[in-house]
Regions:
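N-terminal leader segment of winged-helix/HTH proteins
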Residues: 1-31
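Residues within the alpha-helical elements of helix-turn-helix
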Residues: 59, 97, 114
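N-terminal helix-turn-helix DNA-binding core of bacterial DNA-binding proteins
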Residues: 24-62
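Canonical helix-turn-helix DNA-binding module
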Residues: 53-88
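Basic, amphipathic "hinge/linker" alpha-helix immediately C-terminal to the N-terminal HTH DNA-binding motif
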Residues: 86-105
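Arg/Lys-rich, alpha-helical DNA-contact motif
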Residues: 104-135
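C-terminal regulatory/oligomerization modules of transcriptional regulators
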Residues: 1-13, 127-152
Length: 152
């Protein structure tokens, strides 16, 4: 048994299976970047009542043409309605996905803060991994946090 196996309790074959699984799972043909766009659009609409390509460009630190290209892709996939110079509106499915991402982010950030991570780092770390956790893992994490809250 090597050191990593001792720490993780996983042998090499199990780690390889996990790597294969992580690289084969598709999130309904969504990329992490698509989810970031949906999340930003949702947050902007919640905050301002609307989202513009300029706002999205600013928040995601990407060019306006990149935003326009992604808006067209998200429109084609049915996550939003986009008409150049007319605005951006999330579809019901786009809203559902954005809320789910927002909830995952909040849950992860809350967990990190419970274990003593400062808020800024907790949010940055949550942003980095919110797209990669299995729904069952998120469910168990939520149950764990709720149990902790009962005892505090």
């Amino acid at each position: 048994m090597n050191k990593l196996s001792e720490v993780t309790g996983l042998d090499k074959d199990n780690r390889l299976v996990a790597i294969r699984y992580a690289n084969s799972v598709k999130k309904e043909d969504r990329t992490d970047r698509m989810e970031d766009y949906l999340e930003v659009i949702y947050e902007l609409v919640q905050e301002k009542g609307y989202a513009t390509t300029v706002d999205i460009s600013s928040y995601l630190n990407v060019s306006s043409p990149s935003v326009t290209k992604m808006m067209q892709k998200l429109d084609e996939t049915g996550y939003l309605k986009y008409e150049k110079y007319r605005g951006i509106k999330l579809t019901n499915e786009g809203t559902r996905i954005a809320r789910n991402i927002r909830n995952r982010h909040g849950l992860l950030a809350e967990f990190f803060m419970i274990i003593g991570v400062d808020e800024e780092t907790a949010n940055n770390d949550a942003e980095g991994i919110e797209h990669h956790l299995h729904p069952e893992t998120m469910k168990k994490l939520e149950e764990f946090i709720n149990e902790l809250k009962k005892h505090n």
